[in-house]
């Protein structure tokens, strides 16, 4: 029997029925699902030091278990001393089993390591059922060795869902274990 991530199994067995009951879907295909997770990291100082991009790509690769790619600038910005085509960040897109594994690790081991953690804000929804979460320090992930970090930096995590409204997306992410703050 093939390995199935814990959260994927939980989604199929419990979350689909809970969301169907809550929103009254007529068909299982109407139930929103998590489509992808995009983790991105901007490295503004990379304009002067090219090695910072390599560190960012390496850190994202360690955190996600999938090779990250460097992002490049699309146009010149003279005030930032930036030229078109220069690397300015890194990103990785997770789908399928790796996506569920990352979400599981984020909820169970990484978010509880944040100082004074009382839940994540529910203000990161974009109106179309996607959620954006900012992480201030990469050292909350157990895969990162604190002694080998040359600079503490944050990252953006985007949860792309098939939900059409923010309410549906919040219910989906809450059922999958994201700890939102109580109002």
UniProtKB/Swiss-Prot annotation:
Pfam family for this entry, one: Ribosomal_L5_C
Gene Ontology CC: ribonucleoprotein complex; ribosome
Record-level GO BP terms: translation
Recorded GO MF terms: rRNA binding; structural constituent of ribosome; tRNA binding
Record's function text: This is one of the proteins that bind and probably mediate the attachment of the 5S RNA into the large ribosomal subunit, where it forms part of the central protuberance. In the 70S ribosome it contacts protein S13 of the 30S subunit (bridge B1b), connecting the 2 subunits; this bridge is implicated in subunit movement. Contacts the P site tRNA; the 5S rRNA and some of its associated proteins might help stabilize positioning of ribosome-bound tRNAs.
PANTHER family: 60S RIBOSOMAL PROTEIN L11-RELATED
Family classification: Belongs to the universal ribosomal protein uL5 family.
Subunit comment: Part of the 50S ribosomal subunit; part of the 5S rRNA/L5/L18/L25 subcomplex. Contacts the 5S rRNA and the P site tRNA. Forms a bridge to the 30S subunit in the 70S ribosome.
Name of this chain's protein: Large ribosomal subunit protein uL5
Organism field: Flavobacterium psychrophilum (strain ATCC 49511 / DSM 21280 / CIP 103535 / JIP02/86)
Name of the gene: rplE
């Amino acid at each position: 029997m093939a390995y199935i991530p814990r959260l994927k199994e939980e989604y199929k067995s419990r979350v689909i029925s809970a969301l169907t009951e809550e929103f009254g879907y007529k068909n299982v295909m109407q139930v929103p699902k998590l489509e992808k997770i995009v983790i991105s990291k901007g490295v503004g100082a990379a304009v002067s030091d090219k090695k910072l991009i390599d560190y960012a790509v390496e850190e994202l690769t360690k955190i996600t278990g999938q090779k990250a790619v460097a992002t490049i600038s699309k146009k010149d910005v003279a005030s930032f001393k930036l030229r078109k085509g220069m690397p300015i960040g890194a990103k990785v897109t997770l789908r399928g089993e790796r996506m569920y594994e990352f979400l599981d690790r984020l909820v169970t081991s990484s978010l509880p390591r944040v100082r004074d953690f009382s839940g994540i804000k529910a203000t990161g929804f974009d109106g179309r059922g996607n959620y954006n979460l900012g992480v201030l320090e990469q050292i909350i992930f157990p895969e990162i060795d604190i002694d080998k970090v040359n600079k503490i930096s944050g990252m953006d995590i985007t949860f792309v869902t098939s939900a059409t409204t923010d309410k549906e997306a919040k219910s989906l992410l809450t059922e999958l274990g994201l700890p939102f703050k109580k109002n």
